[in-house]
Amino acid sequence: ALSSAASDVYKRQVQDLRDAAAYLPHRVTVRAGDFPDLGACDVIINSVGKIELLYQSHDRLTEMDYTVPAVRSYAQKIKDSGFDGVLINITNPCDIVTRELALGLGLPRGRIFGTGTGLDTSRLLSALARQTGIDHKSITCYMLGEHGNQQFTPWSCVSFRGMPLDVWAEK
C-alpha cells in the first residue's frame, strides 16, 4: 500500500511498482491505500522528503526542518493502523528520522532500519571492486557514522579475499 500527499506522483509510483513487481520471484501486491491500510503491510518504506531543499545545500540536515515534523505528523497514524512489520527509512537526515520513527512507532528493536550508511557502504564496495578488479563479493568494507558529511570508512576493517587492507597493499 502506498500513502502519499502528492496524488499525481502517488498514482505514478503505484503503477511503477506494479510494473516492476512482474519481475520479482515471488508474489507481491501493490495497491493504493491510506494510513489505516498500512496495518496489513509486511514492510513500509518511509520516503517522505522535499528534494528541492537540497538544491540550496548538500547538507542532509537541511531537510530536517521538513522531514522530522512530517514523520511526527503521521507516525501515530501508522501505529494506530496496527502495523507490526519492518520499516525501512530512506528519508534524510536518515539517522535522525529513523530515530524519530523508532520513538513514534514503538516497534520492537530490529524492526526499523535506516539505509543511510548501507547505501554508502555499497558505493564504497563498488568503487573498491572497480579500482582493484576484485569481485565485490570478496571485499569487506563499511561506512560508519551519521549518513552524509559525518560518515567515515574504518580502513582497518577493510579486507580483500579475507586479507586485511594493509597486508593486501604490501603485495
Where are these regions (language model features)?
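Redox-cofactor binding/interface segments in oxidoreductases and associated redox assembly factors
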Residues: 44-46, 89
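Substrate/ligand-engaging "lid" and interaction regions
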Residues: 115, 122-171
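Short, surface-exposed basic-aromatic patches at helix termini and helix-loop junctions that form
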Residues: 18-22, 99-110, 129-134
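Short glycine-rich, flexible loops that bind phosphorylated cofactors or substrates
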Residues: 52-53, 96
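Single conserved hydrophobic/aromatic residue that forms the stacking wall/gate
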Residues: 1-6
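Conserved N-terminal Rossmann-fold NAD(P) cofactor-binding segment
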Residues: 8-41
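Conserved NAD(P)H cofactor-binding loop of Rossmann-fold oxidoreductase domains
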Residues: 48-50
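Rossmann-like NAD(P)(H) cofactor-binding subdomain of soluble oxidoreductases
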Residues: 59-117, 122-125
